[in-house]
């Protein structure tokens, strides 16, 4: 299964996918291209080091409509079967989302439907978790639709919020123990044909 991975920053989750493909933990999956939202994303260097083509498509430079067209054209040209948003801080355009319905997944660093939506990215969900005093947090892999963090939920994993946690320690633990576990799992489930969406709910087939 050919996938494209969209990134905006350091590419830690991208690296986890690269490593698990290399180790054989993820099978029958090939990263055809890494697409970054900006030229300064370190994820581009990770892609190059792994021999994966990388490209920058910037909504800021192109404008929303041209960005949507450029993204859709690029995905179609490389024959992508699944789009993976891994620390991608922009929103895909409506044409792209419609053309790849139930073929775009995102990793969110909280347990949707809590601490999600527009503006909830990076360190912010973890700050909000600690400010609210909740006792567990985690990560969610979900399909992408036209609204922020509202697509059908595929997988979730939780960790305890510790009394001495800071936003940074919580972010690091969730990334390692949740995000880098369930994002590769979701990719493998989709590659194996085990995910179906019925009435906007995800069912994992045995």
Regions found by a protein language model. Give the residues of each.
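One-carbon transfer enzymes
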Residues: 1-206
């Amino acid at each position: 299964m050919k996938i494209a991975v969209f990134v905006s920053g350091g590419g830690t989750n991208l690296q986890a996918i690269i490593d698990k493909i290399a180790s054989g933990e993820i099978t029958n999956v090939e990263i055809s291209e890494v697409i970054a939202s900006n030229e300064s994303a370190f994820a581009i260097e990770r892609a190059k080091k792994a021999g994966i083509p990388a490209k920058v498509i910037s909504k800021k430079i192109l404008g929303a409509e041209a960005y949507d067209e450029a993204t859709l054209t690029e995905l179609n040209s490389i024959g992508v079967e699944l789009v993976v948003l891994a620390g991608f801080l922009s929103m895909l355009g409506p044409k792209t989302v419609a053309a790849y319905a139930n073929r775009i997944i995102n990793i969110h660093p909280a347990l949707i439907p809590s601490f999600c939506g527009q503006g909830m990215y990076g360190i912010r969900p973890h700050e909000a978790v600690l400010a609210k005093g909740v006792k567990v947090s985690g990560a969610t892999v979900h399909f992408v639709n036209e609204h922020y963090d509202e697509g059908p939920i595929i997988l979730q994993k939780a960790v305890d919020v510790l009394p001495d946690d800071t936003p940074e320690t919580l972010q690091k633990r969730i990334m390692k123990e949740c995000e880098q576990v369930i994002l590769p799992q979701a990719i493998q489930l989709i590659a194996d044909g085990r995910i179906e969406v019925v009435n906007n709910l995800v069912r994992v087939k045995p």
